[in-house]
């Protein structure tokens, strides 16, 4: 693939330089406004359009040891959470550079590992104060509130988002981009929602309402006082409960006032919009899929006697390139594509209930289940092996067809591959056979239709056959949805089946993979938010809190070091402990620099600033104010309240009542941080090439540099 290359200095840490190089390629994927890339193959000159970190790494040369470690970390995050991958890759690069700087200053590796690990654990504990509980989502569903109503008020430079038709509203909100991914709502004690835009945005001087600010701080920080920390990795990082001040490492404290009120999110549409991060079209489909699952559960359980759980394993996608995006929708049942040659079969079956058989493995003559032992000492001698193969498969296909006729089966779902000859025979006899069906789909039809999955067609009996399945075209005019591979979309469903299919369409075939990836990212965000029953306040608040707390911690560590530097050699018996006191402030500041780079790039990518330097300067201004306040979380909430005061001075405050909040999922974000730092520290500790001594100083300049091709 044609990608950039980077000069590598062999005097420095090779593994960390490679990680920084890989991470540099994915900077444009950070944030809600992603810039797509074209990857061109040098050999065949074919190009691929990508807009996600996972697809990018698939196109890079990751054959090196560090590249394989990076790929494993990204795949682990993607396979589990389907979100947080861009954050992981960016922090890998930022923290690799931070570790390189520490090495350049002579900080011992053991100190780097220890302090950075404890620093990240500390951040994971501190961000608990920005948790928003998500409870009783389905008990408080508002049928009058729709996703489209909230989407209408989103303003963004992104082409796939709608812009309000009210030009006065656009002028009032000039410069505020992608409200759904950069806004925040906090409820005060009176319950009235207060809308506020992203924290890190240039603003004019405003006067804050002190009473409102105090109420907001009390409301959101109350949970911190009564919550015991879960992540305790060091005796230096324990937190004291039920006190006026919350204890932090080395005397770091936040003074908070206890209150019985905490902010909660109890609306599905509000939660979905807040987690969409600007991708409204995909999240709207996900929200509709959850609604269908909930309605089906209510019917099956009698008004939901048991708590409803969103089952993401029963959500499927069907991609149909070539159709307009307006054709995308969500339907109950299973939608898939079959060959156009099945058109007369479907017309024959669509007006009648169909009996179904489920085959677990392949439906071929030579298929044998896992663990099958072939009989020994059996030889077949024939003059023509081709005649043997043809006649054998023909006889087998005829036998399968006779079984289907005997039990009046017109629909066969196969988890594996299907014999082409059998498919032809079934089409002629008006029977539909579909292969490569997902195991969850098979299980859903088994539960709803009363069928039993079997490994071989010879195992089929009356008890294994299900009934009541409906087969129909997805559209009333099937020829309108024929793709370039001559396939048509059909719908399979039966009463009570717990399956939902999202039909994804796009006129540009190259963008279908992007659309499907974005759908699953939104689906997993909503899934983990509902599963964990909590989310983070979004819009950069979590990362800024980490940045601020680490800077305060570093300054306090520096003061302690200066206070005891005159006698540390005499008072300390441990070299590690004494070195820790000296280098701890430096390592913490470099760790915090990773968060600052993250926020600067995020702001730059959203086009709020002309350069990353300008964005970094603005963040530095807020950082100084937050550290001076002594309570970063209180400062964050206070800044939000100031923005509220400015917004509600406009004439459109009545319309802003419907502007959505922004949220982040908790565990996927924390795990992305942890995996990024673990990878960097692993590369640091496993790279044994340490360049020191006279032998290396005698190398010429050509030996000390090289190229890393991506």
UniProtKB/Swiss-Prot annotation:
Its main location: other. Keywords: Cell projection, Cilium. GO terms for cellular component: cilium. It is found in: Cell projection, Cilium. The keyword DNA repair does not apply. The keyword rRNA-binding does not apply. GO terms for biological process: chaperone-mediated protein complex assembly; photoreceptor cell maintenance. It holds the Pfam family Cpn60_TCP1. GO terms for molecular function: ATP binding. Belongs to the TCP-1 chaperonin family. BBS12 subfamily. Component of the chaperonin-containing T-complex (TRiC), a molecular chaperone complex that assists the folding of proteins upon ATP hydrolysis. As part of the TRiC complex may play a role in the assembly of BBSome, a complex involved in ciliogenesis regulating transports vesicles to the cilia. Involved in adipogenic differentiation. Component of the chaperonin-containing T-complex (TRiC), a heterooligomeric complex of about 850 to 900 kDa that forms two stacked rings, 12 to 16 nm in diameter. Interacts with MKKS. This is Chaperonin-containing T-complex member BBS12. The lineage of its organism: Eukaryota, Metazoa, Chordata, Craniata, Vertebrata.
